[in-house]
């Protein structure tokens, strides 16, 4: 078999290797896959076109071009920390994918690096998110807003870190998504978002009989009642009994007024039992305010 390989005409091998070159999209995808998604489709097309769309020659040309010693950043995929990871998701549903990555190299990442979509299914319109420059061995979480496809099924896509000059580096991050009508991933992330928002809002201190469902006027009246003496006061009791109007009129009832005055006069008499004259004068003074004087006006 090996002798047969040696006897083959190199020109024939060249023609054989170029079979199917009309399907350039397939060659570009295969070239990108063999390189571990280190090159974008436009770069793959450049090397393939330079080598007459020969896949093997294009790969060799790429490595010859990249042979100079270039300091490439390092990135290691740590774990998928997506909320609800592993759950299926309904069609046409927004969700967030979050990955934990680490700068596993000895140098800090250059500025302007990003996490970029490189192949497979693209979920939504976001194809790139900027990532801050990580120090050596530093770990960070990167989130991407996505949307599930409109049809049920299994989907997969690939993302990679990329420098500002277009150089891909680090591990390939895979997105494997199960789309089902009864999926719970969207609901799980919404509930988690509500819980996070509630826990981060400042809470107001509630005192007394504050009712969050009552009108502001009722809450203010409740606060005013709390400021009063809980046991009441003798002055409040007297003022309410003496000056409170009758239910059907604004003025005190005449009978009630006369009874109060007679009781006040009697109390005055009882306070001075030593002198009958003084008692009469006090009674005369009290009666004189409202009617005839039984003993004459003094």
UniProtKB/Swiss-Prot annotation:
Cellular component terms per the entry's GO annotation: centrosome; cytoplasm; cytosol; nuclear speck; nucleus; phagophore assembly site
Listed GO biological process terms: innate immune response; macroautophagy; negative regulation of defense response to virus; negative regulation of DNA binding; negative regulation of protein localization to nucleus; negative regulation of tumor necrosis factor production; negative regulation of type I interferon production
Expression sites (tissue/organ): Expressed in lung (at protein level).
Claim: Aminoacyl-tRNA synthetase is one of the keywords in the record: no
Main location: cytoplasm
Disulfide-linked positions: none
UniProt feature, compositional bias: Polar residues: 262-277
Composition skew (Low complexity), residue ranges: 242-255
Pfam families membership: N_BRCA1_IG, UBA_4
Cellular localisation: Cytoplasm; Nucleus
Keywords tagged on the record: Cytoplasm, Immunity, Innate immunity, Nucleus, Phosphoprotein
Modified residues (Phosphoserine): 215, 222, 272
Subunit annotation: Interacts with IRF3; the interaction inhibits IRF3 binding to its DNA consensus sequence.
Role according to the record: Negative regulator of innate antiviral response. Blocks IRF3-dependent cytokine production such as IFNA, IFNB and TNF. Interacts with IRF3 and inhibits IRF3 recruitment to type I IFN promoter sequences while also reducing nuclear levels of the coactivators EP300 and CREBBP.
Protein name according to UniProt: Protein ILRUN
Native species: Homo sapiens (Human)
Gene coding for it: ILRUN
């Amino acid at each position: 078999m090996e002798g047969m390989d040696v006897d083959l005409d190199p020109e024939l091998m060249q023609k054989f290797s170029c079979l199917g070159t009309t399907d350039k999209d397939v060659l570009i995808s295969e070239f990108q896959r063999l390189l571990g998604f280190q090159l974008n489709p436009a770069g793959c097309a450049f090397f393939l076109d330079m080598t007459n769309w020969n896949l093997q020659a294009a790969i060799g040309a790429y490595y010859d071009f990249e042979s100079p010693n270039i300091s490439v950043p390092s990135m290691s995929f740590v774990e998928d920390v997506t909320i609800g990871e592993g759950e299926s998701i309904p069609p046409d549903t927004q969700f967030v994918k979050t990955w934990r990555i680490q700068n596993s190299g000895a140098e800090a990442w250059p500025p302007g690096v990003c996490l970029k979509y490189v192949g497979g299914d693209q979920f939504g319109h976001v194809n790139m998110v900027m990532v801050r420059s990580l120090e050596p061995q530093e770990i960070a979480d990167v989130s991407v807003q996505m949307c599930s496809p409109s049809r049920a099924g299994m989907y997969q896509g690939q993302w990679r870190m990329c420098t500002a000059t277009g150089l891909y580096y680090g591990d390939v991050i895979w997105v494997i998504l199960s789309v089902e009508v009864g999926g719970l991933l969207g609901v799980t992330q919404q509930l988690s978002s509500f819980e996070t928002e509630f826990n981060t809002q400042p809470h107001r201190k509630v005192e007394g009989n504050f009712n969050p469902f009552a009108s502001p006027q009722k809450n203010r009246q409740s606060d005013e009642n709390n400021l009063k003496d809980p046991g009441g006061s003798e002055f409040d009791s007297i003022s309410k009994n003496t000056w409170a109007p009758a239910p059907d009129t604004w003025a005190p009832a005449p009978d009630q007024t006369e009874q109060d005055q007679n009781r006040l006069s009697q109390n005055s008499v009882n306070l001075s039992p030593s002198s009958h004259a003084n008692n009469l004068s006090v009674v005369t003074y009290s009666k004189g305010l409202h009617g005839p004087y039984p003993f004459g006006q003094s």
